[in-house]
Amino acid sequence: MTSLKRSQTERPVTADRASVVSTDGTPKVHTDDFYMRRFRSQNGSLGSSVMAAVGPPRSEGPHHITSTPGVPKMGVRARIADWPPRKENVKESSRSSQEIETSSCLESLSSKGSPVSQGSSVSLNSNDSAMLKSIQNTLKNKTGPAESMDSRFLMPEAYPSSPRKALRRIRQRSNSDITISELDVDSFDECISPTYKSGPSLHREYGSTSSIDKQGTSGESFFGLLKGYKDDRADRGPTPTKLSDFLITGGGKGSGFSLDVIDGPISQRENLRLFKEREKPLKRRSKSETGDSSIFRKLRNAKGEELGKSSDLEDNRSEDSVRPWTCPKCFAHYDVQSILFDLNEAIMNRHNVIKRRNTTTGASAAAVASLVSGPLSHSTSFSSPMGSTEDFNSKGSLGMDQGDDKSNELVMSCPYFRNEIGGEGERKISLSKSNSGSFSGCESTSFESALSSHCTNAGVAVLEVPKESLMLHLDRVRRYTVEHVDLGAYYYRKCFYQKEHWNYFGADENLGPVAVSIRREKPEDMKENGSPYNYRIIFRTSELMTLRGSVLEDAIPSTAKHSTARGLPLKEVLEHVIPELNVQCLRLAFNTPKVTEQLMKLDEQGLNYQQKVGIMYCKAGQSTEEEMYNTPKVTEQFMKLDEQGLNYQQKVGIMYCKAGQSTEEEMYNNESAGPAFEEFLQLLGERVRLKGFEKYRAQLDTKTDSTGTHSLYTTYKDYEIMFHVSTMLPYTPNNKQQLLRKRHIGNDIVTIVFQEPGAQPFSPKNIRSHFQHVFVIVRAHNPCTESVCYSVAVTRSRDVPSFGPPIPKGVTFPKSNVFRDFLLAKVINAENAAHKSEKFRAMATRTRQEYLKDLAEKNVTNTPIDPSGKFPFISLASKKKEKSKPYPGAELSSMGAIVWAVRAKDYNKAMEFDCLLGISNEFIVLIEQETKSVVFNCSCRDVIGWTSSDSSLKIFYERGECISVESFMSSEDIKEIVKRLQFVSKGCESVEMTLRRNGLGQLGFHVNYEGIVADVEPYGYAWQAGLKQGSRLVEICKVAVATLSHEQMIDLLRTSVTVKVVIIPPHDDCTPRRSCSETYRMPVMEYKMNEGVSYEYKFPFRSNNKWQRNAGKGAHSPQVPLQLQSPMISRVNAGKGDGKMPLPERAANIPRSISSDGRPLERRLSPGSDIYVTVSSMALARSQCRNSPSNLSSSSETGSGGGTYRQKSMPEGFGVSRRSPASIDRQNTQSDIGGSGKSTPSWQRSEDSLADQMEPTCHLPAVSKVLPAFRESPSGRLMRQDPVVHLSPNKQGHSDSHYSSHSSSNTLSSNASSAHSDEKWYDGDRTESDLNSYNYLQGTSADSGIDTASYGLSHGSTASLGASTSSPRSGPGKEKVAPLWHSSSEVLSLADRTLETEGHGMDRKTESSLSLDIHSKSQGGSSPLTRENSTFSINDATSHTSTMSSRHSASPVVFSSARSSPKEELHPTTSSQLAPSFSSSSSSSSGPRTFYPRQGATSKYLIGWKKPEGTINSVGFMDTRKRHQSDGNEIAHTRLRASTRDLRASPKPTSKSTIEEDLKKLIDLESPTPESQKNFKFHGLSSPQSPFPSTPTSRRALHRTLSDESIYSSQREHFFTSRASLLDQALPNDVFFSSTYPSLPKSLPLRRPSYTLGMKSLHGEFFASDSSLTDIQETRRQPIPDPGLMPLPDTASDLDWSNLVDAAKAYEVQRASFFAASDENHRPLSAASNSDQLEEQALVQMKSYSSSKDSSPTLASKVDQLEGMLKMLREDLKKEKEDKAHLQAEVEHLREDNLRLQEESQNASDKLKKFTEWVFNTIDMS
């Protein structure tokens, strides 16, 4: 309906009950009730609700009464006229206005038309009260129409704008000819008192009330009468323009009482509440003072039983009856709306069912309101024939809604509409980070709600979820929830249809027609829980709310025996559940298809109407309902229907607004679409040809093209949406109103308004339509360009509830499918929400009543629900049986929602409110009683614990967020709730502890960033108090951990004098209690304050390359092209292409510390890529590791998120002015291993350096126990991790000493802390990833940070590594635990073994994995290392071990750029995996950064890669301490250059430095220059901006880094037995060239010489380092004689460096080829043999080298010899390069083939699907 037609309120209603006015203004009353007419004419008041129905039209005024002869006062008229006496009234004027209003409301005889002031109200004595009530009842019976009226809407208060508002009730009969002069002077003052807001002057200005007012059946109100007869006489009383404001008088309870549901300031629920309160005193008075009004009751009942509420109800029901109805606790509700079912409200609203609410709604309300800016006379253009106009005087009429004052460039504030312009979010009442003080309410809420893992509050519908249907809801994170849909409407279809059940219909005297369905079932899943039988019940009344649910048989008191085949009497079941229902009125329904069909229509009416649902229950080819129900396969069809989901249909209008336009006519007159609009339409849906279109057509003509030739159609989830596009509908050149277009769009409930840049802000007041309730405004920015984006705003009619998804504040949506989904979800939810507005609910209610009447009258038998009632005399003979008591607590095992009335605390608004707490087998919901809306919901599987007392309960869920409720009904409620929680969740009661500090101020435990206790010091105070590993802190000193950042948490623990904590105990196996969302879903991030962006932006769901976190794409690699990102990823991911794996796996594979952003990899910090890699590999190796705090999460690994994590690759102090790590290392070396952990120099942190930024994510507690840390579930997600390994996102493994205590014996002091956590964890500018990266990392440290004292390197903590190393036990699937006593080397070897097994399986799969390029830009920033195809596959695992081991070991990390192909890495023992990465990274990221260079900050340490069987790959030169300028960068580059060169198919920037220079630098260690230190940047570790100048440190004998093996061996026997040993023996300065070569022919030969500088650990301490995985094999190895230190040439001596370099290169190549061959041929050989050969070769080379060094002359003489060798080697090298190129080409081909095969597979799958559908359709047809 559009405004082109006169609105309902503007037209006279010609029903038999309506009254119309002739053109001359004479009232013509069309009613057969002569007495009513006389009564009305004489009094002119229409005081009763009945009279409103037959009252005169709104245009009539009070004068007409004086102009017509008065009817003689006779009989009742005379008594009424003279009563009550004036004096009595004066005396009783003190009576509260509330009672008088109540009297007027119920008796309806108070004078409506006469000017009365509310202040001095008239009081009635008890006899008068009874008489009036009786008269009212009598008159109501006489006037048939009255039965349909609801007195609430007919009293003056129902008209906020009515003139009567300011008039006070006077002590006189209700004659309309009264004048102002007759008002009492004392009461007159009240009219002009400050509380009277209608206007300052007493002048008469009558006008009809707003068309939005609720009106009677006639569509006219009494106050409309006054307007038509208005004159200008000044003696008339003032006309109140807004009744509701007038009613706001001093202190009356009823102040502000308005029943104008649509536009009144008070909600319908509030009105009802006030109405009930006002009703109480009257009932008490009428009963006590009058005794019994049975005569009148009988009189009325004789006239008609179904009219109004019976006097029995009024007189006999207790006060409790006016309270909200509470369902018996034994009843388990099926859905949310069942909990909202209120029987008392249904009784009170019964009369309102068939009342037609003739109102101006939607956009028309705003349009009319905006047009009336002055007195009524100014709006003549809208007057109806009877002079009824909507007087919305915006200034004078304070009753008019003014809008919400929210405006922006898209939409303007408008009366009767509410705007959503961004930042509005769902209400949050829980105590969580989103509503804590540090967050800005709405912005964080909207973001949080988009991110939230569970349903939105408006999206919760069905609460009882069958076990087989319990879903993890994994897709909710990326899919929008459809809201405001009553999915419980399918309860009958799912649980009753075609199953044995009973239907009973009847007409209850209080409730009207009712329908009950009841079914007894024996659910399989309940046998174990107790009661084997369950009764499912549906109770329907004329109200839209329906009671649906079940009750266990054991919970019902009965005279019959429970659990028998016969069951309990249905009468007893219903009487117990619905005691207010008169079961005697029920009769059994016919068991016919028609009844079933009618019931389904009745139940699904809301869905059918709201969605225009086409429920597809017919087979193809069928057309009639009879065919459908008589078909044998109906059952199959319904099953299909349930399985496939229903197909909903919606129609949505789209209006096109060009630049400068704003009005409806302008938009409708845009003949064709512009390019920006076309672009938008193309994104939104598919352009379809209407002629012959067979899908949902939305009233468009698909036969003759009369409504246009094309339209826009799309589908979203289960919805079909047809758009009525203004430019696609027919254009009529001569019709400015474009009726053909408006005919469709004007009848759409939801309309999209598309604005071109420059369009005027939209306002609903420019639209005239009763149906358009919601407008979604979309404005294009930069249309038709690559940067096109859209901003969105919504304006909705004020009685339409809010709906999602929320619009983020200040965000524009790029053109993408994400935006399309957002917009379609918004539109669907808008229409669903609009159907909850009063207009549509009234229409639906009328329809529902008709259905029920039809069922109750025409489809019942004569069989009552209790057949025994036919022979009542039988019961006289025997004593009546007593009912057995129900089993106590039986209902607690129900599957549906058990409900308790509680008072909940709203932490966001700091207030309490009454609500209903419902707990089902799947959900916990809180429903506010006043607004009847869900304000909180979460899955029962997300509950982790609770704290209970006698009257209050705090429930903790997900990550420690909590809600708090109090019981005020019964002291037993809390106990029952706790029992119910125990039944439906895995949580437990919390424990409160008071923790003491030891002498050092330490609490004795580590806590990770999630608040989970990572480790507890044995026998410490915390241990004694009962704190266990895996316990979850939820409160610290009364502050909820969920509201704290990690830094704040640690500060509380450090600074509080008395530390009181509330913990959730772990499971029996010491794993922490986790919510389902944490276990199975992506972790929710800790947001920084930038959260304005929509979730979808942060998590690019649709771009595969952005999800590479799992693959660990070395987030550090400078943008590795997708293809390079190794297929490995996909292989690792079970063959699912990169980023395409299903969310669950993805989620699992996304370690928290990894950033989820999709930003270019190069931007992701690669703190030393190596570091990263390491970590990442570690993390990824178990890619599933979810960071569980418990195991803490090793998952934080660097993963791809790389950059955003602050894993510090070096201790913070490493950057500016820090002491050289070397020195630090030295300090701690010994202590690390077992020392006290106190020797930690505390480095100051430098905020900028990347090193800081990259805290390793793995923070292993420094304890030496290694628990099984990861269990990888089949799906690849770490199901449980044992706490030991903590990879704290922000802390470096142990190596950052500050983060964790280094010594394995660390006492876990409670002070340390993640101080660094505030540093920015992102590089340079924050990119998406930061936003979205799991900022977990942000400050978290795996250990509680609670060890302040410990800052040294924790390399020593074997545990740390160990833990992590063991973690990758996934290979064999076994968990190996390294006992506390394992030495780090043992741990490593253990890891080796596990990895070995893994490696075998995986090595072939991982292609060129992790090759890091550490190419640095010598000018200045270091570019992140890139891992080739970065994928972490198991390599990672292997790498873990290696990295771990190295971490473990305190050995300085050496950057070894060993190149090992994935194969190698996977080699049985982990191959030397990414050397660099592991090397430094190993420590850096996941492992303790144990590797700090001993040489100087400038040195890069690469850890050597271990050769598969433990061969040592590289021991390398680490001492870069003294280098000449630019060395640092160059060195780094050179070291890895080979690898980058080899691994990357694409050319990589090469550094200026040459190998020769590098060798010089490496060899000439004694001559460093300060500049070199300045220039040197720790590659992956430092951000371009943050160089790490290292403080010069005395060289202090280059403690060469014993390569892992050598370290090992040294630990065992201090002589070198390992292969590395002989290399290690070189002087601290010696250079070893060790590199492992991949033997994997299929993968690119990854060769990178790993140059590492061996460093001797200080104090002779040896740590297990990477390559020492060969622990197992050392016993088999023969010690190799110590070759002695190799002397290096004096730097000053003449030396032909070019020759030397050539020789070195030749040697390297030769070795490389040798390795490749041996790898290929002897892969199975033990590492020992490989290493032996290698060592021999190395020995020979070294010997020759050393001999050459002995004397310069000798060296010179051998130059020729070396040159010869060099030529040969060059040739070999050339061949190798050619081979490599060939292999690279093959890899590319394989990748292409893989993609092609995937596409073909997809196509085949699609075809198969189509074929299957065709087959089924064919079968159906047959």
UniProtKB/Swiss-Prot annotation:
Residues 992-1068 form the PDZ domain. Residues 84-94, 1395-1407 have a biased composition (Basic and acidic residues). GO terms for molecular function: actin filament binding; ephrin receptor binding; GTPase activator activity; protein kinase binding; protein-containing complex binding; ubiquitin protein ligase binding. Ubiquitinated and degraded by the SCF(BTRC) following phosphorylation by PLK2. Phosphorylated at Ser-1367 by CDK5, creating a docking site for the POLO box domains of PLK2. Subsequently, PLK2 binds and phosphorylates SIPA1L1, leading to ubiquitination and degradation by the proteasome. Residues 95-125, 1188-1198, 1300-1315, 1358-1367, 1437-1451, 1471-1486 have a biased composition (Low complexity). It comes from the Eukaryota. The keyword Zinc-finger does not apply. The modification Phosphothreonine is found at residues 1348, 1569. Keywords: Coiled coil, Cytoplasm, Cytoskeleton, GTPase activation, Methylation, Phosphoprotein, Synapse, Synaptosome, Ubl conjugation. Transmembrane segments: none annotated. Residues 638-855 form the Rap-GAP domain. Residues 1-30, 47-125, 277-297, 1134-1165, 1183-1252, 1286-1324, 1358-1382, 1395-1493, 1567-1595 are annotated as: Disordered. The keyword Cytoplasm applies. It is found in: Cytoplasm, Cytoskeleton; Postsynaptic density; Synapse, Synaptosome. Residues 1753-1813 form a coiled coil. Stimulates the GTPase activity of RAP2A. Promotes reorganization of the actin cytoskeleton and recruits DLG4 to F-actin. Contributes to the regulation of dendritic spine morphogenesis. PANTHER family: RAP GTPASE-ACTIVATING PROTEIN, SIGNAL-INDUCED PROLIFERATION-ASSOCIATED 1-LIKE PROTEIN 1. Interacts (via PDZ domain) with EPHA4 (via PDZ motif); controls neuronal morphology through regulation of the RAP1 (RAP1A or RAP1B) and RAP2 (RAP2A, RAP2B or RAP2C) GTPases. Interacts with DLG4, PDLIM5, PDLIM7 and LZTS3. Interacts with the actin cytoskeleton. This is Signal-induced proliferation-associated 1-like protein 1. It comes from Rattus norvegicus. The gene is Sipa1l1.
